[in-house]
Amino acid sequence: PEDPVLGVLNALTLAASKRNIDLPGLMAKGDMLIHGTTYAINAIITGNTAKTALLTTAGHPDILVLREGGRVEPFNFLVPYPKPYIPRALTFEVPERMDSHGQQVIPLDEEAVLSIIEKLKSKNVEAIAVCLLWSIANSSHEDRVGDLLAKHLPGVPYSLSNILNPALREYRRASAVAIDASLKPLMT
């Protein structure tokens, strides 16, 4: 079935009927149910994820394009970079900046964020990834962007890099949060 949970429930119901009990009776007999699925990885591989936008610090819109700078064949210029997980057309620059010590360099421009939110509405995005520079040192700007998204785009899931993957290296946080956000509409 299209809903993967329904498939699991149907299989459990069938198993229960083979034992001449109902589903609640079967579930009561067990201590734990572990279910694994390839649903998320299949969606990524086939490109059937949600239409996702990326919000990042102004001046750094190409983080998913440039990655960490390496190429599989650094001297073969015929080998193209892979396409970014979120297209550049759905990447938005947020005027703000924290430094590596968590000190605010540029205040968060909330009016600009609200303007971006209006653009997100017009583009009918289904999920939003947020990865601001140095949010791992001070998450206040990223958290505030999350608050604004929740208020002005209710029902649209979003992921914040400082919560999902609070680690050094912007690309790793950006790619993790992009994947997480893109799967939320499918997995909930």
Where are these regions (language model features)?
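N-terminally biased helix-coil "hinge/interface" segments that flank
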Residues: 1-188
